[in-house]
Amino acid sequence: MGALCRRLARGASLAAVYGLAFAYGPAVAADEPSAIRLDVHGESRARYESLSGQFRRDFEGDDQAFFLRTLLGAEATAGAFSLGFELQDSRSYLDDAGTPLTNSFVNALDVIQAYVKIKTPSVLGAGSTTDWILGRQTVSIASRRQIERVDFANVIKAYTGLHAITTTPRGDALHLLYVALVDRLPADRESVIENNIVADEEQWNRRFWGVHYRRADALPALLPDVWLEAFVYGVNETDTDETPTPNRRYATPGGRIYRAPARARVDFDIEGSLRYGSRRATSAADDTQDLDVEASQLIARLGYTFDAAWRPRIALQYYWASGDEDPNDDRFDQYERLFGGRRGDLNNTSLHGPLTPANLSAPGVRLDARAKRWDARIHYSAASLASKTDTFVIARLRDPTGAAGSFMGHVIDTRARFWIVPKRLQLELGASAFVFGEFTRDVPGAPEGERTLFGYSQLTAFL
């Protein structure tokens, strides 16, 4: 524990030097009157992470890494037309052969947004408008559980295609989306470790689409400030020599009922979805058998915010994501997390993050608090496999006989953020613990020890 604290202190010092240099560097202004408005935005972030103990298969010992991420973007607008562009530079240092490093952590100097946007009137009523965004872009919709522009992860995922966003004066929103995935390059471990610069490329054989509608204040006579949402998302993949895939062909309909937290009132967030379609067991070229897919996901959270200066809130939560019951049949019933987020609902990610919405049954409780310049939360989950014969996904551990049981373990997750300079410089500290349950201790290939401890210190400077 002392070694972990010393590592975090060193990481905080590195982050401070890096962040201060960015925050107090030259500012870019775009306030001069002009026919063309130029909005410039950016951030530079430094994060040191330390992990004591391992839960992933084939990894052992302690780990650490120092991650840097810099974003710089601009949008030029003339009337109803806009052009947008954003660069991302994501790098890793202090890692070693035992670090589970992939291109989800490193993507040195690449374009994540290059788009044209056109604003037009909409058919959803007086005052409604539609933004038509065409090109390479990042996407977040609603709860971000289906598709998210990640915040905590070191690399932001991009897509290329069309995203139409219709909004109304009363707060309704309609999203229409059809995009191809962008492959983060390089993908080989040696190039990732070296922070090599390789241009990302579109994967035209992997397409993602969606329709998502939100009705604001949908039940005013019954309960004010309740949002109702309905959506359907889909994935279509085909194999190519350059990009082998499991040939996913999914449709995922679902819905959400949501009431935002506010002082002295009850809030809730219930979202569920069903997934139908087919896929193959692997991405191998000789795997040509399609498996039927029928999977489900549900999260339900009920909270209450007390009427106090720092807005303390307590919430109960349950997260379910189905698992595959029989590894030998012609079905695949695991609910895969594809492009949505998991940190906001479950745990810190990056070098840690044992929980993901796939083969999961996890009741939990969380406490939140926030004031003008700081916010904090602590979250506890008692995590089990939804199917004890399916995989503990992040750890890549599986007992197809089910003899190891289903209880993965106890997860405690914390985070605190403080604005050193409001809107310009933010410090974030976090820690997590994963105490192994019977499955994680007894499964074939089980990790050494009985727990993992994780901590990080992060400094972000904003333009």
How should each PLM-predicted stretch be described?
Residues 22-41, 59, 328-331, 338, ...:
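Outer-membrane beta-barrel biogenesis signature
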Residues 11-23:
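Bacterial N-terminal signal peptides
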Residues 1-9:
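N-terminal secretory signal peptides that target proteins for export/translocation
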Residues 32, 56-186, 192-196, 453-456:
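Outer-membrane beta-barrel channel domains
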Residues 30-37, 122-130, 150-328, 370-372, ...:
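Signature for the C-terminal beta-barrel architecture of outer-membrane proteins
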Residues 53-58, 97-100, 144-147, 192-197, ...:
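Extracytoplasmic loops and strand-loop junctions of Gram-negative outer membrane beta-barrel proteins
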Residues 32-55, 82-85, 132, 226-229:
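Transmembrane beta-strand segments of Gram-negative outer membrane beta-barrel proteins
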Residues 47-67, 443, 447:
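Surface-exposed strand-loop-strand hairpins of Gram-negative outer-membrane beta-barrel proteins
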